[in-house]
Amino acid sequence: MLVEARKKLIFALDVESGASAEEWVRRLRGKVGVFKVGKQLFTRCGPDVVRMIRDHGGEVFLDLKFHDIPNTVAKAAIEACRLGVRMFNVHALGGRAMMAGAAEAVREYFAAGEDVPPLLLGVTILTSSSEETLREVGVDRPVEEMVPRLACLAKGAGLDGVVASPREVGLIRRACGRDFAIVTPGVRPSFAETNDQQRIMTPGEAIAAGSDFLVVGRPIAASEDPVGAAQRIVEEMAAALEEG
């Protein structure tokens, strides 16, 4: 189960330079399954950071949360495919047409080839968002209603899964079924601080709830022993998988 659990652990490369990113990739390759590249690192380094990770044999989650007019997002989706990422995401709040356009672009790009397409994920509600945050932007529905609603919208648009807090995993499973990937940030092992995440669980709890992939950054990066921290998280995930 350790190998399977390791494939499900995504390390967030929330760093300020390509050199720092490469240092982490060298340190953690083989210890985690996927490396997440977000807006800060991608804006600083561009596509080269994705190529660097792949050159080291790593998989990439391109976490840019595309949200624009459908044509623009569809073209961005094609560029993500060209980079060879393992998964990337769009904002579910962008609507059905935007998500469906991205899904169709991915299908068409891989239609004639033998390569495996990336997982296309919809971002539901950010784990840093509370109901007060939603009310500030005019959304009066509770988080536990909005998340499965957006997940169903994403599935109907042809996406492969969603990004959501582990607290809503059960709601998504009931609404969308088992054959729908759920990637969960907001995961904090017992030995780590919660930081700015609001709706969190431990790695074991998240896996037990039905998460397919866990995104972890600071609990590993801020540890005195990052490799050991990653291993402890993988072991907790593996134990939950065995119990499940």
Curated annotation (Swiss-Prot):
CDD domains attached to this UniProt entry: OMP_decarboxylase_like
Catalyzed reactions: orotidine 5'-phosphate + H(+) = UMP + CO2
GO BP annotations, alphabetical order: 'de novo' pyrimidine nucleobase biosynthetic process; 'de novo' UMP biosynthetic process
Keyword Transcription regulation set for record: no
A GO cellular-component term linked to this record: cytosol
Active site residues of this protein: K65 (proton donor)
PROSITE patterns: OMPDECASE
Binding site for substrate: 14, 36, 63-72, 127, 188, 197, 217-218
Any one GO molecular function term: orotidine-5'-phosphate decarboxylase activity
Pathway connected to this protein: Pyrimidine metabolism; UMP biosynthesis via de novo pathway; UMP from orotate: step 2/2
EC number: 4.1.1.23
Gene3D superfamilies tied to this protein: Aldolase class I
Enzyme superclass (EC): lyase
Keyword vocabulary terms for this entry: Decarboxylase, Lyase, Pyrimidine biosynthesis
InterPro entries according to UniProt: Aldolase_TIM (IPR013785), OMPdecase (IPR014732), OMPdecase_AS (IPR018089), OMPdecase_bac (IPR047596), OMPdeCOase_dom (IPR001754), RibuloseP-bd_barrel (IPR011060)
Assembly: Homodimer.
Family: Belongs to the OMP decarboxylase family. Type 1 subfamily.
Function: Catalyzes the decarboxylation of orotidine 5'-monophosphate (OMP) to uridine 5'-monophosphate (UMP).
UniProt name for this protein: Orotidine 5'-phosphate decarboxylase
Organism: Syntrophotalea carbinolica (strain DSM 2380 / NBRC 103641 / GraBd1)
Gene it is expressed from: pyrF
